[in-house]
Amino acid sequence: VSLADCTITKTGSSSNTENGDFYGMNAALLAENGAQVTVTGGEVTTSATNGNGIFSYGSGTVVNVSGTKIRTAERNSGGIQTTGGGKMNAEDLDVQTEGNSSAAIRSDRGGGTVNVKGGTYVTNGTGSPAIYSTADISVSDAVLTANNSEGIVVEGKNFVKLTDCTLSGKMQGTYNDDSENIQCIMIYQSMSGDADVGEAYFEANGGEITSLAGDMFYVTNTSCEIKLSGVKFNMADGVLLRAVGNSSSRGWGKSGENGGDVKMTLTDQTVEGDIVVDEISSLDLDMSGSVLTGAINADNSGGNISVFLDENSTWNLTSDCYVSSFDGDISNINAGEFHLYVNGEMVV
């Protein structure tokens, strides 16, 4: 099916939120059961709960959409949504969502593959990041703006890769006052069954990421790999990464056992900010041709923390730091008035 320069409008209400989130009920355009759909230009508008703009559901389903304007007004209404193993290819879209739980680039149970090139993606509701990933999502040359939420959320064994994107997140407060952190990018495991349990992956190459409130990265109840190269970071509160457990009040694992285990790789990356790791979490930091200005485990309460600096990397301390192991040349650490402790021993 091919649609060119069409206007699609969806009104009404939803009888079942999960059917809308998982299977596309109430979407303006739903492709399923192996359908092949191409949408070019035109406008998609919804004013219904679960009024996702364009929805790809099921293995073998492919949606190609380009140059389309998408507007959604109510909750649980993403701009483009992919679930159940579907595929979405989007280029140069103009997407804006207003409701809560309405990511501009949205996925849910069963995931799939999403490729986005160019375009603008804006969200205005709470719990509405520009990208919510329970899928494999790659985005290049796009502007991603979350005005009342994190910029990106990765749940479970899924990934987000950004190339030359401009991202900003402005989480105004904790959801219903029951969240424990404010951040720009969250990587976690919810235990809801919407995402497979396993290592999450986030990668950013080039572009700019701005946190207008809270930490840059927050990792809890999961393991993940974060790769950063040539990104310009603008920090809100001075914390680059917070890998910690949570109270489990929202079902995110068992308290005391739900930390964040992070492997972070910096390649040709300059960044300023602290790294916080609690006693049930861990960090493996690998720096190549990079500069980090900040403290790691300044309060000496973290779990296993290893740091590797290659000969072309520099670590500028902003406080006393405590790590389990260090691999590199001590001369590449600018300590100033501070000290680095490795396994309890002061080395600089």
Residue ranges with predicted function:
Residues 1, 16, 25-33, 52-58, ...:
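Glycine-rich beta-solenoid repeat tracts in large extracellular/virion proteins
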Residues 2-24, 36-50, 61, 66-76, ...:
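Beta-strand-rich solenoid/repeat architectures in extracellular/passenger domains
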Residues 88, 137, 159-160:
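Hydrophobic residues embedded in beta-strands of well-ordered beta-sheets
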Residues 276-348:
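Extracellular beta-strand/loop-rich repeat segments of large surface/secreted proteins
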